[in-house]
Amino acid sequence: SQGSSAQSPCLAGSFQNQNRQASGIDADPGFYVSLNASPNQSACAPGEYQSSPGQSSCLLSDPGYFSSGTASSSQEVCQPGTYQPTPGQTSCLDTDPGYFAPNSGQSEQTAAPLDEYVPSSKSSSTEPCPDKTITISSAAISIDDCLLDSDGDRIHDGADQDDDGDGINDLQDSCPLGLTDWSSDANSDNDSDGCKDSDEDEDDD
């Protein structure tokens, strides 16, 4: 019988750079071959990777990951303090002040919760506000955003008409920053001056 004289082209995902070969060569990890009968494999571009041999295309890096160079066989994870929301990227983004990324592989930065702040970029944790202070919104960037809240009612003293929460308006309260955790009434504050009779008021009447 006669041998076949027909040549079969290498299929996509394989290549052959030598004559008279019986089969194609699978593309290496980090490379691809998109067309049939290709003499060469092509490297995956930055932002892409390919972990398997014999492939006809590369994969975009996932959100939370990146691929910085050519011919990458794997994607790299964003480290704590960084994030990446977009696929196919060559690097991660540093978190902004007021935000943090506590874990690896984050696709979003996280706003500092109430009563915490983040003063710098590329942060993986937050700082707590001092005792008896609050923030009025998330994503605080400075300890200056921590405002005094003497009575713990989540209204900072600058806007609170009753800083110690005793039921007496500060304008009429003789002890506006006095004891907290009590309310003015006939038994505790006989003269309604905002000073607790048993502990603060030397002139109950």
Residue ranges of predicted features:
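Extracellular, cysteine-rich, disulfide-stabilized repeat modules with beta-strand cores
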Residues: 1-4, 15-21, 32-39, 49-55, ...
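Extracellular calcium-associated, cysteine-rich motifs in secreted modular proteins
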Residues: 8, 26, 79, 94-97, ...
